């Protein structure tokens, strides 16, 4: 069983939102709307949040 199968609906929605935010940061960086440093900061923050949710679901 994968960790995401244990998520509540609210946690699943939160993970999805973090994944979208992370993806949008990479797109914004690729199009020159934000710096690489800003993109890295957003990606790191989203990854940490997803990891915390995953650890709670494991």
For each of these PLM feature ranges, what is it?
Residues 32, 39, 53-56:
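Hydrophobic stripe of amphipathic alpha-helices that form coiled-coil interfaces
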Residues 1-5, 52-58:
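Short intrinsically disordered terminal tails
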Residues 16-19, 44-51:
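Generic structural signal for well-ordered, non-transmembrane alpha-helical segments
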Residues 12, 36-47:
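Short, charged, amphipathic alpha-helical segments
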Residues 1-33:
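N-terminal acidic leader/helix
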């Amino acid at each position: 069983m994968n960790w995401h199968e244990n998520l509540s609906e609210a946690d699943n929605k939160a993970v999805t939102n973090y994944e979208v935010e992370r993806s949008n940061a990479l797109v914004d960086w690729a199009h020159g709307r934000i710096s690489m440093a800003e993109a890295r900061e957003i990606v790191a923050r989203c990854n940490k949040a997803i990891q915390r949710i995953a650890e709670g679901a494991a």
